[in-house]
Amino acid sequence: MANGVAFVRRDASNMRDWDPALYWYARAVGRMQQRPGTDPTSWVFQGCIHGVPPTITETNEAFSQCPHGGWFFLPWHRGYLWYFERIVRATIKEIAAEENITPDPSTGWALPYWDYALDTPTSDPIEDFTSRALPAAFRSPKMPDSPNGTKLTVDNPLFLPEKQATSTADFWQTPHRSPGTNSAFEVLPYTDINPFTAISQTVFAATHTRQTDQPSFGSEISYTSMDHFRRGFGELENVPHNQVHGGVGGWMGSVAGAARDPIFWLHHSNIDRLWSSWLSKDNLNPDHTSWLDQTFIFFDENGQIQKPTSREFLGIDPRDYGYESLTDGNGTRPVVVPPAQVPEAGERVLATAAGNPRQLLSLHEPTEVSLEPADAVSRAMRSMTAPSTPQNLILTVHNVRTDVPPGTPFHVFLNGPSGELDPAGPYFVGWISFFGAADVDGALHDHGGHDVSFDVTEQVLRLQEQGLLPDGPATISIVPSVPQPVAGAADAAAKATAPQPSFGSISLTTV
């Protein structure tokens, strides 16, 4: 429990359905949604600070700032949440004054967090909502009509309907989540949100090159650039951050729409909590002035522009808030640690698999491709054990993109036999998230699809030692983390309008 701070952020996964913190959050969101989009304290304006949907024509210097894939990812989002929290608190105070509610519920209100890793997995079948399900207040279309009400009779601003968009225009009609999200006992499996690897890092940010890759907690050093998905993800931004965005899907799976889903703010509150937890283990933030003195643009509860720097949001208990727990939901050590994700492919191409021109990924079952030529793959695998020719093997899935968010991350496997594509098993390579790689984001991230690279050197050695990597073609399997139901023969329209995640090619290269 945080000590000596004015506001304590609590875990929504441990709250009763309509805990006062969630009730008043819903009331404030509803009021903010009623404000004109030009009001800096409105729901629309605050969402546009993260990203601007194509339906919004207004412009502002604060819009579309969100840095991803660079070392400002954590301090920028921390400042973003802090000013948003103040706006919500002031809105709660406004509502309570109008309704003569005492004591003032805004006095101790703090933004909750969603600790999706709180419940660790068991071998028992999942028959009820876990901490990886959306908190109950976000799943219900209705909410109580008063702080102590028990009947759900009022429209709930925290709830978004599920929808499978049929086009970019249809996607942006109304905020929504991917089909199945609201009713899921777990939005994602534990392996996709386990923050153990991130929390275990000792370096905040590193410079990645073709020759070296140093895993880091935060994302790649970007100096003074507020990058958008152009550099390397840190472990925390990769898992759980990107995977949760992709798992909730809908507008949460889009950079331009994410902050318009009320669960966004609880997701990022948990990401911020994990940063505080990492710092509590005597890890250190960067001390470079280009990181400390970077200026961001936000608006406060009075609608006044504020331009704080990173150095104003440091520490375990930054500014005036702390967290209920810095130890719960910090993850558990995986049985097999997957390969590190690296920002770039290697230099010498050994084998490829082309999409001709693009390979669509199945939302229902594994998509398998073979790397060719097979003899080059076999030679490369064998050379891993030759001490005279040290080299790293880099597996890259090129030009990953989708039309609309698919509502699930994907798992990548190397030579996994049919029926053994388990992310806790030895063949698991890593994740592909389509957050930031969707065509619906338009010009916000106009650099095309992502390249996702993994250093599979140690994995190949481990598979060889265990006799699990025989000579012959290398097969890459890409599997939806949460397979979608297969549409029946009568659902031809559903098949035709389903998301179309895809990639351009796959390569195996050396460094």
Each predicted region: which residue ranges?
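C-terminal accessory segments of proteins
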Residues: 1-511
